[in-house]
Structures are given as C-alpha cells and as structure tokens.
C-alpha cells in the first residue's frame, strides 16, 4: 500500500493465529523437486506388503516429495485431529507401518540405503499423508467442516510420524499436482466418479485438522490431454 509492504490485514489462514496481509506464494515448475521426476517410482500407484497385508500408495514429487496413502487401510477415517490420532490404542503400530512406507520412499529417492538408515538419516523427506474423500468432520478449532466445502481430506505427517496440525504449503502444492496426475490416489478422490473427467484441477480445497487450505495451479495442456503444473 502506498509503495510499502503491508503488515496488517484481515486475511486468515486456518491453523495460524490472528490475521494479516495476504501473501501469495507461487512455486514455479514444482515437479521433480527432490528426484527430478514427477513420479519417483515411475508409477501413479504402487503397492507394498507389510505383515502380510497389501497397502496402496501414490508417490508424487512436486515442491516436496509426498507419499499419499488411504487412511482406511490403517483402520482410521483420516478426519482425526493430531490429538485424536495420538490417543488411538494402535497409534504406534499405525506409525510403524507408515514409517516403513515412508522409508521405502526414501530408499527410492536415494536418500537412504535401508529402512533403518531412512529412519535415522532421512527423517524429513519424503513426507507421508493420508488422503480420503470429502466428509463432514469437526476441526481441532471446533469449526465444522462440510464435505461440500472441500475436495479431499488430508493429513500430513512430519518427523517421527507427528501429524501436522494444519497443512504445509509445499504439501499443498504436491497435492494439487497429484490431483492433476491421472491415476493417483489424490486424482481419483478429486476427479473420480465423473466429478472431473478432464482431470484438470486449477483449485483444490484441502480439509486439514484445523480447517481448510486452498491451493491453486497454473496448467499447460499436453498433447495427450494431461496437464503439467507450471
């Protein structure tokens, strides 16, 4: 305003105290930030067997590499707050399985030689996240989140399998990129069942533990009809 950066405003971000001036961050060409490839495994979906059970995941690398999994596969809804998740009687066992999948991703990226090395020396990357269809739930703030106001429910985990209270900006960029990648878990949630047959997603509303986060994407249409996030 008047040639100076604004420091006050009425813009609010769910999960961040107070209000302030709106700052829009743009990530240019986010694909392959860690691996040089949008899909580090070369597949839109992969499976892994843990204790005799098969788990499906999508590994997408954009702004930050994130592995998306179905919360239902782990016996949870994906709408849990961090406090609710930590209070689950089988929380430790769920986290053990999540770490195996995350560690496998670290090995794929070349960040670790085995699962133990990944747990010790590659704790921050890749991230892992629950992703599931929109449903009504109550956020940690007490705010009621309605299914019609979001495009998916997401829960990101940080170091030592700590569920994040909100949703990371780089995680949101990866999520909207995954939504534009046909066949990924995120894409099937956002665009499946005839909701968006073009698989073109310029705006996604992510329901997280403390509310809703918006992420936007500028797209280039490819010759095969797919879209690249610019």
Give residue ranges: language-model regions.
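Non-transmembrane, aqueous-exposed alpha-helical and coiled segments at domain scale
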Residues: 1-230
């Amino acid at each position: 305003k008047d040639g100076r950066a604004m420091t006050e405003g009425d813009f609010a971000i769910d999960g961040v105290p107070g209000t302030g001036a709106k700052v829009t961050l743009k990530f240019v060409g986010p694909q392959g930030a860690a691996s040089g490839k949008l899909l580090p495994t070369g597949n839109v979906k992969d499976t892994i067997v843990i204790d005799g059970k098969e788990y499906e995941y999508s590994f997408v690398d954009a702004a930050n590499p994130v592995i998306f999994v179905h919360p239902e596969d782990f016996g949870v809804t994906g709408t849990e707050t961090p406090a609710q998740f930590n209070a689950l009687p089988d929380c430790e066992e769920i986290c053990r399985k999540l770490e195996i999948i995350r560690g496998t991703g670290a090995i794929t990226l070349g960040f670790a030689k085995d699962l133990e090395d990944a747990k010790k020396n590659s704790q921050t990357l890749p991230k892992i996240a629950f992703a599931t269809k929109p449903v009504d739930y109550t956020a940690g703030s007490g705010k009621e989140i309605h299914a019609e106001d979001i495009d998916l429910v997401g829960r990101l985990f940080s170091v030592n399998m700590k569920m994040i209270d909100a949703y990371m900006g780089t995680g949101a960029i990866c999520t909207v990129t995954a939504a534009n990648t046909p066949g990924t878990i995120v894409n099937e949630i956002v665009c499946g069942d005839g909701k968006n047959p073009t698989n073109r997603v310029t705006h996604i509303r992510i329901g997280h533990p403390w509310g809703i986060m918006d992420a936007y994407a500028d797209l280039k249409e490819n010759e095969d009809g797919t879209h690249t996030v610019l």
